[in-house]
A protein has these predicted regions:
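P-loop NTPase Walker
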Residues: 1-35, 40-41, 169, 175, ...
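Extended, charged low-complexity regulatory segments
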Residues: 1-211, 215, 219-220, 706-707
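Generic detector of solvent-exposed, compositionally biased contiguous segments
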Residues: 54-75, 220-235, 239-250, 396-444, ...
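Short, charged/polar micro-motifs that form catalytic or ligand-binding hotspots
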Residues: 81, 85, 200, 204, ...
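Alpha-helical nucleic-acid-binding subdomain
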Residues: 128, 133, 252-487, 491-509, ...
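Conserved acidic
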Residues: 206, 436, 681
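Phosphate/oxyanion-binding active-site loops and adjacent basic polyanion-contact surfaces
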Residues: 206, 210, 240-244, 453-457, ...
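Conserved helicase motor core of SF1/SF2 NTP-dependent helicases
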Residues: 257-258, 262, 271-275, 279, ...
Length: 712
């Protein structure tokens, strides 16, 4: 739509505001850089003095001064970095208030604060709340800096600024967007498109910034109470992970909570999502937080806690084996197994130490302590006791043997899975249970003989370590007690993994959980269910954050996704091309279609990130090799840590793309063979594949399409 003179004046005013803000930030640079150089010189000089000072009494105050100087240098370095980041994107919102006494105050809302430029960090709850909690012309009442403030919101606007340039303004007066020809006023449908926070031609491929789109209720849940667990449900592309990470960013900001970045963790389902999230965290002001896959985290602990080097192998096993190992019953069987060992140990200790009532009393009073620290503490008591040397040596040898046996977690898992009688006491009745347990017993014998472990055994080993140590060992003799934990794609974790993660936090309220059951693709891992999660956390169900609007996908794509998910309905949202269905005559024509399709997309926008998604990793590798002839040097493989989110064409498989997003997606061979309708996860896997795209979707196959597309 053409701009009126009033529109032009409106935009010019906003451009002047940005220019003056950038000018203020740039004027601060020389001062900050000079302070950094000065701090660096001071730190180096003090280090030189410490090195050259041999007198201990003279050296001590120098050491203290040096530590302070280096801390100041770190602050100066961060100030320098923060300024450069603000110059790229100084703010995303503005709010002006008129208070009851007639005074007017204006704030810019950004990802970081800068007092001189008038920018307030969005994590500064009371002030930022004026932007998030109110609309233009609404009355407000807030307590800010221990002072009651009331009035009304005179002005509220949202912005998109990229590389120091204003590209979008969203206000009650209308939405305006900059294009190659200049500024334009958007109509209603184009406004929906513009709410995507990544514009056309953007090289930035990471989780989008949705801060300006967060609702009042969502802001309240994210920022109001650091002691409350947060659960976020939502459809694909609705910003679940982004909202969760903003919750974490708020918790880590200054004095919003006690959480420290170094003692906080984000756990995701796959390696590619880990890379994606790691690339996003710095842009949200989150530094020093460990992001890992669950298996990566588990392995890092297991390799330190387990003797030797356990070898976990992907084994092709019947689904009932996987279901047993990821069931809620196996979790109880593990606890029962450790309890049985504890009872046997307790009986032995009582028999051996009955001659020494004082030591036996010392053992008995630690009855509620986990077995390994209990043995360690008791061994210390025995060592410090007045027992005769021979008796003391014999008792300590016994306790050391018991500790050694208790720490043999791998043999423990073998023994547990081999003990059909024990398992039968926990698993639900089933006509085939005996034959299933016989098979599991034989499989375990083979694994023990080869010193192999199934990848599905990893969680069992880790849970045993946790139960016997009273927590996950932290490598320094203590146990992990996280300040906060974010769990993404929660629906694909089973009861054992959930128990491990929930027990790893200092307080079960210090947790943020994200998920969508429609995207569950690991069917054997039975999700404990949102009702149980809510119950375990002591929450009310109505306190769950639900995000229903997809900011990623177009309406035609989400309409197809809902149909695949078994919930057919017409979806409102931004417009876009219909999904393209291509039934190829043979493999060669399928490849030719992919080449033509990708070429047309890249020609229209050379910065597009295009994903060609196969069902299995082997299929992805084969497709990449086939496309080499047609697209030499243009196609790369996306697999685990080989993922790159630079623009271009990526071939990958469905399990790698959970939680990710691309500009365009081609689903390769979504046929009945790859996605049989009889398998529960087929529907969810196709849903995941479809909803990875922002704009373009191609479905291409030689064989008939999977019946999942046509039957609810």
């Amino acid at each position: 739509m053409l701009l009126t003179e009033e529109d032009k004046q409106f935009i010019a005013e906003e451009e002047r505001l940005l220019e003056s803000t950038l000018q203020s930030l740039c004027q601060q640079l020389p001062q900050v850089q000079a302070a950094k150089i000065s701090a660096n010189a001071a730190a180096r000089e003090l280090t030189r003095q410490v090195v050259n000072e041999w007198n201990h009494e003279e050296r001590q105050p120098l050491v203290s001064d040096e530590a302070v100087a280096h801390h100041i240098l770190d602050i100066r370095k961060n100030s320098d970095k923060a300024l450069y980041e603000l110059i790229q994107e100084p703010y995303f919102g503005r709010v002006c208030t008129k208070e009851e006494d007639g005074s007017e105050v204006s704030f810019l809302i950004g990802k970081k604060s800068n007092i001189e430029a008038g920018i307030v960090d969005w994590r500064n709850g009371p002030i930022a709340g004026l932007y998030f909690n109110y609309k233009q012309e609404e009355e407000f009442y807030e307590v800010i800096n221990e002072r009651e403030r009331a009035g009304y919101i005179q002005l509220r606007r949202s912005y998109q600024i990229e590389n120091g340039q204003l590209v979008q303004i969203d206000a009650p007066e209308g939405m305006f967007r900059r294009n190659e020809a200049g500024w334009e006023r958007l109509d209603v449908e184009d406004e929906i498109v513009a709410h995507r926070s990544r514009g056309m031609g953007s090289k930035e491929k990471r989780l989008p910034n949705i801060l300006s789109l967060i609702t009042k209720d969502q802001f309240e849940l994210i920022t109001s109470n650091p002691e409350r667990p947060v659960i976020i449900q939502g459809s694909a592309g609705s910003g679940k992970t982004t909202v969760a990470l903003h919750r974490l960013a708020w918790l880590l900001h200054e004095e919003n909570s006690f959480a420290q970045a170094k003692n906080t963790r984000v756990v995701v389902m796959n390696k590619s999502l880990q890379i994606y999230v790691c690339a996003t965290l710095p842009s949200m002001g989150i530094e020093g937080v460990e992001t890992s896959t669950f298996n990566g985290w588990a392995l890092s602990i297991i390799r330190k806690a387990v003797r030797g080097r356990p070898f976990f192998k992907f084994l092709n096993v019947p689904s009932f084996v996987e279901e047993i190992k990821f069931s809620e019953e196996i979790l109880k069987a593990l606890e029962g197994w450790v309890e049985k060992q504890n009872r046997a140990l307790d009986a032995q200790v009582k028999e051996i130490f009955k001659k020494w009532p004082g030591l036996l009393k010392s053992w008995t009073k630690t009855n509620n302590t986990a077995v390994l620290p209990r043995l360690k503490d008791f061994a210390h008591d025995v060592k410090e006791s007045s027992l005769p040397k021979y008796d003391k040596d014999q008792c300590l040898a016994f306790l050391n043997r018991k500790s050694f046996d208790m720490e043999d977690y791998v043999q423990d898992v073998y023994n547990l899975l081999h003990d059909s009688g024990h398992l039968k006491g926990y698993l639900p009745p089933n006509p085939k249970l005996d034959s299933h347990l016989d098979y599991l017993k034989r499989l375990t014998e083979k694994n023990r003989a080869k010193n192999n472990l199934d990848y599905f055994d990893m969680s069992l080993v880790l849970r045993l370590i946790q139960l016997k140590n009273g927590g996950l060992p932290d490598g320094t003799g203590g146990v992990t007690s996280l300040d906060h934990l974010v769990i993404d794609e929660a629906q694909d974790f089973g009861p054992v993994e959930f128990a491990i993660m929930m027990s790893a936090v200092s307080d079960k309220r210090q947790i943020t959980i994200v998920g969508d059951v429609a995207q569950k693709i690991l069917s054997a891992r039975k999700f404990i269910g949102w009702n149980k999660v809510v119950e375990n956390l002591g929450m009310e169900e109505d306190s769950i954050i639900r995000l229903e609007v997809s900011f990623r996908c177009t309406a035609p794509i989400m309409t197809l996704a809902h149909k695949v998910a078994g919930d057919p309905k017409k979806v409102e949202g931004r417009a876009g091309p219909d999904p393209e269905w291509h039934k190829a005559e043979d493999r060669e024509s399928l490849l030719e279609k992919l080449v033509d399709w990708t070429h047309s997309l890249v020609k229209a926008d050379p910065y597009k990130l295009i994903a060609l998604i196969c069902r299995y990793p082997k299929q992805a590798m084969e497709l990449k090799e086939e496309l080499k002839e047609y697209l030499p040097g243009e196609v790369r493989l996306g697999h685990r840590d080989q993922f790159s989110f630079e623009p271009g064409i990526m071939v990958t498989n469905i399990h790698q793309v959970k939680g990710l997003e691309f500009d365009s997606v081609a689903l390769i061979e979504p046929d009945e063979e790859n996605y049989p309708i009889r398998r529960e996860e087929s529907r969810n896997m196709i849903y995941v594949g479809i909803t990875r795209t922002q704009d373009d979707l191609l479905l291409t196959t030689v064989k008939p399409f999977s019946r999942v597309f046509f039957y609810n």
